[in-house]
Amino acid sequence: MSDTPKLNQRPEWTALADHAKGTLPHPDLRELFAQDPGRAERYVVRVGDLRIDYSKHLVTDETLALLQELAAATGVSGLRDAMFRGERINITEDRAVLHTALRAPRDAVIEVDGENVVPQVHAVLDKMAGFADRVRSGEWTGHTGRRIRNVVNIGIGGSDLGPAMAYEALRAFTDRSLTLRFVSNVDGADLHEAVRDLDPAETLFIIASKTFTTIETITNATSARSWLLDGLGGDEKAVAKHFVALSTNAEKVADFGIDTANMFEFWDWVGGRYSFDSAIGLSLMIAIGPDRFREMLDGFRIVDEHFRNAEAPANAPLLLGLLGVWYGDFLGAQSHAVLPYSHYLSKFTAYLQQLDMESNGKSVDREGNPVQWQTGPVVWGTPGTNGQHAYYQLIHQGTKLIPADFIGFARPVDELSEELKAQHDLLMANFFAQTQALAFGKTPDEVRAEGVPEELVPHKTFRGNHPTTTVLAAELTPSVLGQLIALYEHKVFVQGAIWNIDSFDQWGVELGKVLAKRVEPALTEGADVPGLDPSTAALVAAYRELKEVH
């Protein structure tokens, strides 16, 4: 039995709890800035192209020092180094965690079980690049000899969210002669809408499933195969020219009709939610080209090296992870908003939902004991300025503490017209105004000074002290996207290390899958399913009745 004290019994934890209740019970950002004129410049971290301003957080130098002591006591740096060394830190699956190897330079040496995996990584990247170039140039043609103009990625979870998010983020860098679509939902409507206006002769499907057995993905892939064959006269040979696989199961890939020469591998030391810079990113590489894809990998690597080498408090992922622990475990926050002021980042928060909530949505520690502290928050948000006309009301004047990240860029993408570029200043005016309003609010006296009737003063008062991080970069490029993703990857790692949970398994997704296999015969064949609870049994019966209504 370990002699290591539980997290909430550590003196560093107790010191933070005392600090939250005693020294800093009601932090006021107006006072903190007034007391420290240099706060705005001191509370900034720079990494790569990112300027990260954390001055509007409910912390003091003492808070930050105590948080850093907690990180040291919980062995964050040791676990970080073990991850980079390729040790099996995913303890429940006995796996290494080496998504960082996916963006390592060719001359790096990163070993798993004594074998350098970097040559394998670059062999797959080179194979991807060769294939992507053939599709982009028109050298790769479909069964009828026509060039590919449509690419449909079929996957789910990490095999979908990552490439779909990155494609939207980097649309300005894509080949606009190519149409990319992403299918993940086993709801047949998803595939139907994705292909309904496409020409099968010009469509390539990328099937992303490591085992080639993922039920949602293979169901959609089989339906896509039927759609293709229906459109091309039923010739089975067409499959090999219109389907490629991201998988390691050569036998099942071949059985499907895919040429295993067009199978792109990845490894069990890459978790799904960390995988889109592996072969899972093939659709993105086709869209933006191999050179841009490698620029994105360079961006990942910038933050990887920063996380590995920068000392606190200048280590950005460590800092952001500690701030999350501060709010969740000591100030009672239950959620975290990520608010990108870029239309191109419309799927970024959804991507972070999987990254964060699947990683740290755990209630037992690494030893299997129930945790006695808060773990991962609910992550949510949409691009600005849309959210301002929806849920910002609750953030400003509601009863919940919701830390928020604001992500913005100084320049719009080049391909916009001059008139549309001019709108960017309006977008960013809102970006800066919201963080100011959230931090400093509007006092009753300030409201009264505007001549507001006394009975309306409480309604128009903003208490402020809503914490935000501002992440600012010159523009959204492939490298900057890689930097942003790696920043959040390592932030999530830091929090999992402090909470002593395994951030790299996801057993919570399994039970529903198992039960779905048992329930399906009741829906399709009317079979009895033993063990259904009364509520679910009644719902299944109602479903069957409704199916028969026309």
UniProtKB/Swiss-Prot annotation:
Belongs to the GPI family. This is Glucose-6-phosphate isomerase 1. InterPro entries: G6P_Isomerase, G6P_Isomerase_C, Phosphoglucose_isomerase_CS, SIS_dom_sf, SIS_PGI_1, SIS_PGI_2. The active site is at residues 358, 389, 513. Catalyzes the reversible isomerization of glucose-6-phosphate to fructose-6-phosphate. The keyword Repeat does not apply. GO terms for cellular component: cytosol. NCBIfam families: PRK00179.1. The keyword Calcium does not apply. Its EC number is 5.3.1.9. Its main location: cytoplasm. Keywords: Cytoplasm, Gluconeogenesis, Glycolysis, Isomerase. Pathway: Carbohydrate biosynthesis; gluconeogenesis; Carbohydrate degradation; glycolysis; D-glyceraldehyde 3-phosphate and glycerone phosphate from D-glucose: step 2/4. Pfam families: PGI. PANTHER family: GLUCOSE-6-PHOSPHATE ISOMERASE. It is found in: Cytoplasm. One of its GO terms (molecular function) is glucose-6-phosphate isomerase activity. It catalyses: alpha-D-glucose 6-phosphate = beta-D-fructose 6-phosphate. One of its GO terms (biological process) is gluconeogenesis. The gene is pgi1. It comes from Streptomyces coelicolor (strain ATCC BAA-471 / A3(2) / M145). Transmembrane segments: none annotated. Gene3D superfamilies: 1.10.1390.10, Glucose-6-phosphate isomerase like protein, domain 1.
